[in-house]
Amino acid sequence: MAAEREPPPLGDGKPTDFEELEDGEDLFTSTVSTLESSPSSPDPASFLAEDISTNSNGPKPAEVALDDDREDLFAEATEEVSLDSPEREPILSSETSPAVTPVTPTTLIAPRIESKSMSAPVIFDRSRDEIEEEANGDVFDIEIGVSDPEKVGDGMNAYMAYRVTTKTSLSMFSKSEFSVKRRFSDFLGLHSKLASKYLHVGYIVPPAPEKSIVGMTKVKVGKEDSSSTEFVEKRRAALERYLQRTVKHPTLLQDPDLRQFLESSELPRAVNTQALSGAGILRMVNKAADAVNKMTIKMNESDAWFEEKQQQFENQDQQLRKLHASVEALVCHRKELSANTAAFAKSAAMLGNSEDHTALSRALSQLAEVEEKIDQLHQEQAFADFYMFSELLSDYIRLIAAVKGVFDHRVKCWQKWEDAQITLLKKRETEAKMMVANKPDKIQQAKNEIREWEAKVQQGERDFEQISKTIRKEVGRFEKERVKDFKTVIIKYLESLVQTQQQLIKYWEAFLPEAKAIA
Amino acid sequence: CAGPRLGAAMMEGLDDGPDFLSEEDRGLKAINVDLQSDAALQVDISDALSERDKVKFTVHTKSSLPNFKQNEFSVVRQHEEFIWLHDSFIENEDYAGYIIPPAPPRPDFDASREKLQKLGEGEGSMTKEEFTKMKQELEAEYLAIFKKTVAMHEVFLCRVAAHPILRKDLNFHVFLEYNQDLSVRGKNKKEKLEDFFKNMVKSADGVIVSGVKDVDDFFEHERTFLLEYHNRVKDASAKSDRMTRSHKSAADDYNRIGSSLYALGTQDSTDICKFFLKVSELFDKTRKIEARVSADEDLKLSDLLKYYLRESQAAKDLLYRRSRSLVDYENANKALDKARAKNKDVLQAETSQQLCCQKFEKISESAKQELIDFKTRRVAAFRKNLVELAELELKHAKGNLQLLQNCLAVLNGDT
């Protein structure tokens, strides 16, 4: 059956072509395209256990989307594996490692999934059929909501639990609507797992919302004031956006950890996300080490695209930060304006009370009422300023940081390849020396090592090409998402401004006759 | 550095919208609505020049009164000369029964100058467009303050010219006509100290005098009313100021947001760059409207309240003077009784008592009329300004709405 399928037309693998594919916004078309990668191409096979090479049909230009073989794996997983399946465990058991393990050469090659040997071809085909079916159905059909923040517990051990509701018609989920309770550290844990699996091979993993020790402490301590409710709402909205972005990513959506997060009622506590835990400190140290490395690695960039893009992201980052600062100032001033308008309203009411001309007195009271309503308007507008505009910008500032991180991983990957080449050279020199010195057993050892390092060099090259390809695709997808996001949110924001003006018109139109009535 | 010179048409071209100026004109003059054109005596400030430390006003008079040598003439005056004129009214016993038009506040460009200076210092840290934008803004601010101070000086003169008694004042005529410097050097330290003590005594007196309940219901009511009103106007004026300032800050933020969006738009390579540029344009335009809203609120609300703060103080001063004369009258009565009892200097006491009585009655009579006029003026001024405020708010909100809707139509059409 699978063999009869006509592969969707693919171009020569340039990022733009990939974008065309995604035009339909169909999660599964991309999966389908990847499923049809040629088994003969060296890249995918190396990632997976051998049996998966039954990758279908159709000669496919090797460049496109081959890295998504991992996606295939998960596609199968969604069809076949229940939560209790033993096959899932190897993935899950890895949950503790990502948080702690720095990116070492061994983990640079993705597969934690190597231990998972999946995919009989039949399953594979079947899943592809089902996927294609769904592909013809609704576009990208999954909706996530984060709601109902609830304080659990007391004192410093208290935490907020959020309800995560998923509505979907995707068949990979067992139900079409379900919800679970999650706490903030669960979200961080999810991100941590996804990041450790996908970041270093070039996927742009959406960053989780930031921790805030001050904010949370206030909530824990039970301060029931407006600033802590604001904080909780800000966090809830941020968590919702985080999940929505994550599920939008076709590769991440297939990840079993993500599914477990959304579906399973009990989630093992992600303890390694605590800021001051041992793991946390180790993370900080590693980040610092990374930073140092970044400065010292000088890569021979053969592809101008990467340099260009990096520069673009750098510029974007700068401008977004500036814009964000201005919008934050606007939020602040708008709140001030609201407070001052309220104060003026009260004062005008008092003035109206003491005014002894009746008509003028009434008009002043009306003015006070109008100003009070306008104060409300300002408050609502400040809310919109913040939640729509300001948060969009801060989300993207963090996303761009993730993008930059992915570029850095590529550089590290290159470094690893370089290092392997250098080591290989050294081993060859050793062999030559041994030959001259005529030490047969040492020669054998040297030959073994040479073989070992030749393989590593090949692997390094493949990894590098892979990550470069992935990044190109990811950046294309990211740019598309960014354009869509900004357009949608900014239009919504402008509509909020429209509403404010319409309300203002209503209020002043009501007041005008009152003012004219002063006789 | 010489500031902007206001031409005869009061700088019709310099501002974005000429209506801004004419509204302002109407606004402040409308604070005293009965200052309509009176052929007998018309005064205005036709020109003004700002030099580093002082402002020079050109006071232009048109009159058919025989007191003046010509029918139309102009002189140049500075702020101190206005204060001299005002003080001469205060010190004139004959005018004790009138509300003396409050003196115009001193021209204060310090804040604006400081901002312009800071901008100059920070020139390196911003883009050329931003710098030009901010410079334009600050210059507009400077201009607005300038126009306001001109208007306030003008209103003072108009009030005097409209007052049936004050307009005949000799000092006033000298002020209008004498084309040399009046040499009224500002008060020196000694005089300022004297003033200070005078005011202290007055407020101490005020406490004593206000304790005396007035026989006349009208004045009793006025006193209670004015006391409370004055305080509340003060509060409202301060709060209105803060509100308009916040509004302006928010408008300034729109400016920066527009600039940032512009930068994002020009450096972006995807199709969103047009989007950003359109939104940037929107923010620039909407900012102008928001700044106008803030300026109009300042004019119609804050300035109105500030002016009536000063006028209500002048009215309180009138009441004080009347109370003082009442106290003098009562003291003269007591002195007369004593003199009669002792049968010594009775005639003197009688004359003194009569004078006090006349003075008190004269003040009471004119004060009553003044306070009634004050109320009429006040109600009319509030009405005019509140109506204009509402109309302007509506105009700007509608303008804003249209801008936003047009922009949204374009943006939605594109995507």
Curated annotation (Swiss-Prot), chain A:
Residues 260-519 are annotated as: Interaction with RhoG. PROSITE patterns: PX. One of its GO terms (biological process) is early endosome to Golgi transport. GO terms for cellular component: cytosol; early endosome membrane; endosome; endosome membrane; lamellipodium; retromer complex. Pfam families: PX (PF00787), Sorting_nexin (PF03700), Vps5 (PF09325). A 1,2-diacyl-sn-glycero-3-phospho-(1D-myo-inositol-3-phosphate) binds at residues 183, 185, 211, 235. SUPFAM superfamilies: BAR/IMD domain-like, PX domain. Residues 140-269 form the PX domain. It comes from Bos taurus. It is found in: Early endosome membrane; Cell projection, Lamellipodium. Residues 1-20, 30-103 are annotated as: Disordered. Predominantly forms heterodimers with BAR domain-containing sorting nexins SNX5, SNX6 and SNX32; can self-associate to form homodimers. The heterodimers are proposed to self-assemble into helical arrays on the membrane to stabilize and expand local membrane curvature underlying endosomal tubule formation. Belongs to the sorting nexin family. The modification Phosphothreonine is found at residues 101, 104. This is Sorting nexin-2. The modification N6-acetyllysine is found at residue 469. One of its GO terms (molecular function) is phosphatidylinositol binding. Involved in several stages of intracellular trafficking. Interacts with membranes containing phosphatidylinositol 3-phosphate (PtdIns(3P)) or phosphatidylinositol 3,5-bisphosphate (PtdIns(3,5)P2). Acts in part as component of the retromer membrane-deforming SNX-BAR subcomplex. The SNX-BAR retromer mediates retrograde transport of cargo proteins from endosomes to the trans-Golgi network (TGN) and is involved in endosome-to-plasma membrane transport for cargo protein recycling. It is a peripheral membrane protein.
